A protein has these predicted regions:
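Serine-dependent carboxylesterase/thioesterase catalytic core
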Residues: 6-14, 51-74, 174, 178-309, ...
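C-terminal motif of bacterial Sec signal peptides marking the signal peptidase cleavage site
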Residues: 2-4
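Intrinsically disordered, low-complexity acidic Ser/Thr-rich regulatory segments
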Residues: 40-45, 99-108, 112-115, 159, ...
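Short, surface-exposed "cap/lid" segments of acyl-processing enzymes
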Residues: 43-145, 234, 238-242
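Lipolytic serine-hydrolase domain surface
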Residues: 13, 56-58, 112, 121-128, ...
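A short loop-to-beta-strand scaffold at the N-terminal edge of the catalytic core in hydrolase folds
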Residues: 33-39
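Active-site catalytic motif of lipid deacylating hydrolases and related acyltransferases
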Residues: 7-32, 47, 54-62, 110-213
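Residue-level signal for secondary-structure boundary elements
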Residues: 80, 192-196, 390, 394
Length: 406
C-alpha cells in the first residue's frame, strides 16, 4: 500500500514538472530601433572588432566572462583562439600606487583567420574588496550557523552584492571610473602583438598611432547591473576629459584623437540594466536635454559631441528585482547629451516561470538577475542583433520586435 502511494505521488510530481518544462514560451519583447549586433563588424579588413566587458555587483575574479564568451564565440563561429590570454594590472598614470583591477584580453578568430575579435574583460572588484571586508565576519560560522540554510545563502548573496552600489557612491567611484578609462585606453592603443602581457602598467592617450586604430577599429561595451552605470559614467568622464583641459591637466589629449572619437558609433549591451535606480540621489551630468544641439549635424554644438551615436541595448527580466527598463525621456534628462544616446529596451525572461502548485506563478529572482549572460537569446541578440538580414533564426522565431521611429 505504501509503495503504491509513493509511486502515485511520484507520478503526479513527474507529470507536473514535465508540464512546466514542455515548451519554452518565455517572454522576449524588443522595443526600439534595429541594431546590427557584433557579427557584421567582424568583417573589417582595415581594423579589428573590440569588446569591453564590465561586471556589476559582487566579487568577481578574472575569467568571470568565460561562459558568456564561449557562447558568443560559438554564435559568431569564432572557432580559433590564442593559446593564452594577456593580462594587465591597471594603474592610474597620475598615481601608479593605485591598484585599479585587472584587464584580461582574449583573441578569437574564425577558421579562415579573416575575422578577428579582441575581447577585453575588466575586473574592478579589487578596488572595493578592502571596504567590503568589513562585513566578512557576518559570513563566518560564528553567525551563519544561526540562520536557516536558505536564509544564510540569501544573506551571503546580500553581503556580496549589496555594498557595491553604496561604495560606488563614495570615494571608490573615482578609482572605478579611472579603471574603465584605462581599459578603453588599452583598447585603442595597440593590436594583439602590441598589447603588454603580465605587466603592471598605466595607459595614456598621447600616442598618435592610436588615432588611426580608433578610426579603423570597431568597439562595443557589454555590462551587467552596476557595470552599466560604470560604463555610462566612464564615457561621461571621457567627455569631460577630452573637453576640459583643466581636468587632469597633466595628461595629453590630442585633438586628432578627439576628432576620431567623434566619428564613432559605439553600442552598449546592458544586462540587468540599473541606470534608473542608480540615478537616484545623483547630480545631473554637465550637459543634458540638448541632444539636438549636439547630435544633429546642423546643431549649434555638433563639433563638441563626444560620440556620433551611443546605442544602448538594455536587457531587463521583469522578474529581476534589481533591473529596470529605460523609460521614455530618461536619455534626454539624465544622460550627457554629448553621448548622442538612443535606447532599445528588451524585456526578456531569463528565469523560467513556474506554477507554484496553484499558489501563483513564480520565477527565481536570483536566476532572473544573474542569468542573462548564459541565455541563448541574449547572446544571439548581442551577436547578430535584430531587424537585419543576419538576425538569428531563433530570435526571429522566439522574440517579437516593435520598431520605433523618430
Amino acid at each position: 500500500m505504501t509503495s503504491g502511494c509513493a509511486s502515485f505521488g511520484r507520478g503526479i510530481a513527474e507529470a507536473y514538472f514535465e508540464k512546466q518544462q514542455a515548451a519554452d514560451t518565455r517572454l522576449c519583447e524588443v522595443t526600439g530601433k534595429a541594431f546590427e549586433g557584433i557579427e557584421p563588424h567582424l568583417d573589417n579588413p582595415q581594423g579589428k572588432m573590440k569588446i569591453l566587458m564590465v561586471h556589476g555587483v559582487g566579487d568577481h575574479l578574472p575569467g568571470y566572462s568565460t561562459q558568456f564568451l564561449e557562447k558568443l564565440a560559438k554564435s559568431l563561429d569564432l572557432t580559433v583562439r590564442a593559446t593564452r590570454n594577456k593580462e594587465i594590472a591597471l594603474r592610474d598614470p597620475l598615481d601608479p600606487s593605485k591598484k585599479l583591477g585587472n584587464l584580461r584580453i582574449h583573441r578569437l578568430l574564425n577558421k579562415s583567420r579573416d575575422k578577428e575579435l579582441l575581447f577585453y574583460e575588466l575586473t574592478w572588484s579589487e578596488i572595493t574588496a578592502k571596504q567590503k571586508a568589513i562585513l566578512s565576519y557576518d559570513n563566518s560560522g560564528e553567525y551563519s550557523f544561526r540562520r536557516a540554510e536558505v536564509n544564510d545563502l540569501l544573506k551571503k548573496f546580500s553581503n556580496d552584492t549589496g555594498p557595491d552600489p553604496i561604495i560606488y557612491l563614495g570615494d571608490s567611484r573615482e578609482n572605478i571610473l579611472i579603471s574603465f578609462v584605462q581599459s578603453f585606453c588599452w583598447m585603442i592603443n595597440g593590436q594583439w602583438d602590441e598589447i603588454p602581457d603580465q605587466q603592471t602598467k598605466a595607459c595614456t592617450f598621447d600616442d598618435l598611432s592610436a588615432v588611426e586604430r580608433l578610426r579603423s577599429d570597431q568597439f562595443a561595451f557589454i555590462s551587467h547591473s552596476l557595470g552599466s552605470r560604470i560604463t555610462i559614467d566612464g564615457l561621461q568622464r571621457l567627455a569631460r576629459f577630452f573637453s576640459d583641459k583643466h581636468f587632469r591637466p597633466e595628461l595629453n589629449r590630442p585633438k586628432e584623437l578627439v576628432e576620431a572619437l567623434q566619428q564613432k558609433q559605439i553600442p552598449i549591451y546592458m544586462m540587468s540594466n540599473q541606470l534608473p535606480m542608480l540615478q537616484l540621489g545623483r547630480q545631473l551630468p554637465e550637459i543634458t536635454g540638448r541632444n539636438v544641439d549636439y547630435c544633429d549635424p546642423e546643431g549649434s554644438h555638433y563639433p563638441d559631441r563626444i560620440l556620433s551615436k551611443t546605442s544602448i541595448i538594455a536587457f531587463s527580466d521583469p522578474n529581476d528585482l534589481l533591473s529596470y527598463a529605460i523609460p521614455q525621456g530618461f536619455v534626454e534628462k539624465y544622460l550627457d547629451s554629448r553621448l548622442c544616446a538612443e535606447v532599445t529596451n528588451i524585456n526578456i525572461n531569463v528565469a523560467k516561470i513556474f506554477d507554484a502548485f496553484g499558489l501563483g506563478k513564480l520565477a527565481n529572482p536570483l536566476e532572473a538577475h544573474i542569468g542573462y549572460d548564459t541565455d541563448k537569446r541574449v547572446v544571439a541578440l548581442i551577436a547578430k542583433g535584430i531587424g537585419n538580414d543576419h538576425t538569428s533564426g531563433m530570435i526571429q522565431k522566439r522574440c517579437s520586435w516593435t520598431e520605433t521611429i523618430d
